[in-house]
Design a protein with these regions (language model features):
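Charged, amphipathic alpha-helical segments and their flanking helix caps
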Residues: 1-37, 41, 50-165
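Beta-strand-rich binding-surface signature
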Residues: 44
Length: 165
């Protein structure tokens, strides 16, 4: 099964944010929307794609080139209170780590923080603090090769991908 570049981008962000576990800032970084562990283990991060927009870079044919923008969400779960200070401190660390490699290891052309939502909700009698940072991740693929990231279309004629161009 092919791995869509979108999935590879989420995985690369999870790997990069793993440094925050090593530093003791969060207890875990997981891909997906659902909390993978009891709230007592917070703070932790959930990383997932929220939506994606695509546009043609070229018109028609099998070799249609797509410009894609993925909204990558990094959700911070702070635990049994809705302490904005803790969420803001972790958000600053997340922003620093993600900005340190805006191509996510070469998968993306660029990425930037496009929005932050700070919230709290109740699960039973426990209030849980949350913040969601949304990063816009810009990348290119061929329409026929959504698993191959960031092709340099001007050099692809001399590469293994020449047959699909």
């Amino acid at each position: 099964m092919l791995l869509h570049v979108r999935r590879a981008i989420v995985d690369a962000a999870v790997d990069a944010l793993g440094d925050l576990v090593t530093l003791g800032i969060v207890t875990a970084v997981k891909s997906g929307r659902q909390a993978p562990m009891p709230i007592a283990t917070a703070p932790y991060l959930l990383v997932y794609g929220r939506q994606e927009r695509s546009a043609n870079l070229t018109i028609g044919g099998r070799a249609r080139k797509l410009d894609r923008e993925l909204i990558l969400a990094v959700e911070i779960v702070t635990g049994e209170d809705d302490n904005d200070e803790e969420a803001d401190a972790i958000a600053a660390d997340v922003e620093f780590v993600i900005a340190d490699d805006p191509t996510l290891g070469g998968l993306a052309k660029d990425l930037w923080l496009s929005g932050t939502t700070i919230d709290a909700n109740a699960e039973g009698e426990i209030r849980i603090g949350r913040a969601r940072l949304e990063f816009t991740v810009s990348y290119h693929t061929l329409a026929t090769a959504p698993d191959i990231p960031k092709l340099d279309f001007t050099r692809a004629r001399n590469s293994q991908y020449a047959a699909i161009l």
